[in-house]
Amino acid sequence: MADESKDTTHFGYRTVAKDEKADMVADVFHSVAAKYDLMNDLMSFGIHRVWKRFTIDCSGVRRGQRVLDLAGGTGDLTAKFSRLVGETGEVVLADINSSMLKVGREKLRNKGIIGNVNYVQANAEALPFPDNYFDCITIAFGLRNVTEKENALASMFRVLKPGGRLLVLEFSKPQFEPLSKAYDAYSFHILPRIGEVVAKDAGSYRYLAESIRMHPDQETLKQMMADVGFENTTYHNLTGGIVALHRGFKF
């Protein structure tokens, strides 16, 4: 990762003031919210659904539990968790971006998913929930956009119950050189063109590609989770390491 002073951070490949990054990321997601689901399907050829299904399967969520779907966006994971926890459980879909939260709320309500789902606009670095509150937290394709990732992980640790688990699904580092080269070519040349045609926004998808390259790799993120208190932290490489699922427990 690039060197950063205490007052600056990265926005893709650019160095920006830390207090500016959140607004810049917000602009990206305000821009792409309406086409977010369609772009996910196009960008990943639908494979994101397999990655999310694997995350659900690894979550261990059961009936009656309380789940936080952080950076939950358009609610793919929330929809699945809602069925798993049942009427006696609760799922909180939290996102810092009001446009994404609006799309997610409308999508789930149109599917009849109501009653055990609540919506909260929240910053991952300072979660507005009590200590020891959730049985499980997921953050899918959201952590790389957070300015202070260590603060966010510590905040998630705080609101987890003892015995609770965090699952981080995020783009990561491909494990094979030929795959890495092909992935770079796709990310930097094809992906922005898809964004321009479908979402009328090549810049946001150029940022997406750059933000993935600046995100901590598998071992670094594993250590970051351990540093804030998570135990038994492991990760699974998916699609050759293009994506990784990290899981850690609070004891």
UniProtKB/Swiss-Prot annotation:
Kinase: present as a keyword of the record?
no
Sorted alphabetically, which keywords does the UniProt record give?
Answer: Menaquinone biosynthesis, Methyltransferase, S-adenosyl-L-methionine, Transferase, Ubiquinone biosynthesis
Q: In which pathway does it act?
A: Quinol/quinone metabolism; menaquinone biosynthesis; menaquinol from 1,4-dihydroxy-2-naphthoate: step 2/2; Cofactor biosynthesis; ubiquinone biosynthesis
Report the function annotation for this chain: Methyltransferase required for the conversion of demethylmenaquinol (DMKH2) to menaquinol (MKH2) and the conversion of 2-polyprenyl-6-methoxy-1,4-benzoquinol (DDMQH2) to 2-polyprenyl-3-methyl-6-methoxy-1,4-benzoquinol (DMQH2).
Q: Which domain of life is it from?
A: Bacteria
Give the GO biological process terms: aerobic respiration; menaquinone biosynthetic process; methylation
Q: State the reactions this protein catalyses.
A: a 2-demethylmenaquinol + S-adenosyl-L-methionine = a menaquinol + S-adenosyl-L-homocysteine + H(+); a 2-methoxy-6-(all-trans-polyprenyl)benzene-1,4-diol + S-adenosyl-L-methionine = a 5-methoxy-2-methyl-3-(all-trans-polyprenyl)benzene-1,4-diol + S-adenosyl-L-homocysteine + H(+)
The UniProt family comment states: Belongs to the class I-like SAM-binding methyltransferase superfamily. MenG/UbiE family.
Pfam families under this entry?
A: Ubie_methyltran (PF01209)
Residues in coiled coil: none
Keyword Protease in annotation: no
Which protein is depicted?
Answer: Ubiquinone/menaquinone biosynthesis C-methyltransferase UbiE
Top-level EC class, please? transferase
Tell me a Gene Ontology molecular-function term this record carries. demethylmenaquinone methyltransferase activity
Which positions in this protein are listed as binding S-adenosyl-L-methionine? 74, 95, 123-124
Q: What is its EC number?
A: 2.1.1.163, 2.1.1.201
